[in-house]
């Protein structure tokens, strides 16, 4: 008997053997890989179906498997189940060496949003993000394909709602997804199409963006992200954009080159996400000026980055104002992460930033 397309998509999901095995080893499942609902994502649900991937940021995986980590904030502390998993899988050394935010500054790492909201309350959230991170370290190619399968599942749900999928892979880290490559066989591409109705491009050593390029071209799939990377080089903002991602540059106020990097990003046509310690309900500034003195300055209009997370829908060359969120366990070391909500010029390491109301 030949199944209809609808019946195939309702049938039990049969994943490729290596993907199914990887997920099982790390206590993961396909529906749980991506987050498709939280208060901010829901704000933009009418624009596109959002899906976001969360890993542990910076050196948080190393901290989570350190028995000597006595953090009073449980999600920032020692997670014995993660340590046991890393030991069992032979990943302890890799986990201790892992840095999920290679361009993160001290204040950014201290005040990371990984520990804001639900992520700051439940060790179970940190453990799930840790298991995903360990799976990435164990087999990057199989994990990349697992994320592709999970995202195709989200795309099918978006299509049922008459929406595009907006996929963000760096929810709480800065992994170089434009450099993560995997082999996608014609048979697997056909299986994805039969199951989810997607059109993916098979190939050897493809990125996720290359695999889903037909749907991006059709307007039904959007890859977007934030990054604190610099402008140039194989890991930089320009390389990420060229690889198929809609990028928003993240302003690092406590970086030695904060103003120069901000100027360069705006000049290259990127949006600039700027955290500001605004009280809830306070109006955002209308403009932002970044100056490096002799090297020049730029003034850009500002938009409210808390209205939705869909940065891809915002114009480029703007300041995206993000109200600072409380990160549980963050101390004074996190304060330089945000600009103060004042109209006077604020001195940074290599210039000034001025908010205008």
Task: Outline where the language-model segments fall.
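Class I S-adenosyl-L-methionine
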Residues: 1-357
């Amino acid at each position: 008997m030949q199944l209809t397309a609808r019946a195939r998509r309702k049938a039990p999901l049969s994943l490729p053997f290596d993907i199914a095995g990887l997920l099982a080893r790390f206590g993961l499942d396909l529906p749980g890989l991506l987050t498709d609902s939280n208060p901010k994502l829901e704000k933009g649900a009418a624009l596109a179906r959002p899906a976001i991937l969360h890993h542990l940021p910076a050196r948080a995986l190393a901290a989570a498997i350190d028995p000597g980590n006595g953090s009073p904030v449980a999600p920032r502390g020692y997670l014995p189940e993660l340590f046991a998993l890393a030991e069992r899988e032979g990943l302890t050394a890799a986990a201790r060496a892992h840095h999920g935010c290679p361009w993160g500054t001290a204040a950014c790492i201290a005040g990371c949003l990984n520990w804001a909201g639900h992520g700051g309350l439940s060790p179970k959230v940190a453990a799930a993000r840790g298991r995903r991170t360990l799976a990435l370290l164990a087999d990057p190619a199989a994990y990349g394909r697992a994320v592709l399968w999970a995202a195709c599942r989200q795309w099918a749900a978006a299509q049922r709602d008459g929406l595009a999928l907006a996929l963000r892979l760096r929810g709480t880290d800065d992994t170089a997804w434009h450099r993560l490559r995997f082999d996608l066989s014609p048979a697997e591409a056909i299986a994805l199409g039969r199951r989810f109705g997607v059109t993916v491009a098979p190939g050897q050593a493809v990125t996720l963006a290359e695999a889903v390029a037909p749907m991006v071209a059709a307007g039904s799939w959007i890859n977007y992200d934030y990054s604190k990377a610099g402008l140039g080089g194989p890991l930089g903002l320009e390389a990420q954009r060229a690889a198929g991602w809609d990028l928003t540059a993240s302003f690092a106020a406590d970086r030695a080159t904060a103003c120069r990097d901000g100027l360069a990003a705006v000049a290259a046509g990127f949006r600039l996400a700027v955290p500001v310690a605004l009280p809830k309900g306070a109006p955002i500034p209308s403009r932002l000026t970044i100056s490096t003195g002799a090297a020049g300055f730029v003034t850009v209009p500002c938009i409210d980055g808390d209205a939705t997370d869909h940065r891809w829908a915002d114009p480029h060359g703007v300041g995206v104002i993000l109200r600072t969120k409380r990160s549980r366990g963050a101390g004074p070391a996190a304060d330089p992460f945000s600009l103060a909500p004042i109209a006077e010029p604020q001195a940074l390491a290599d210039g000034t930033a001025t908010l205008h109301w």
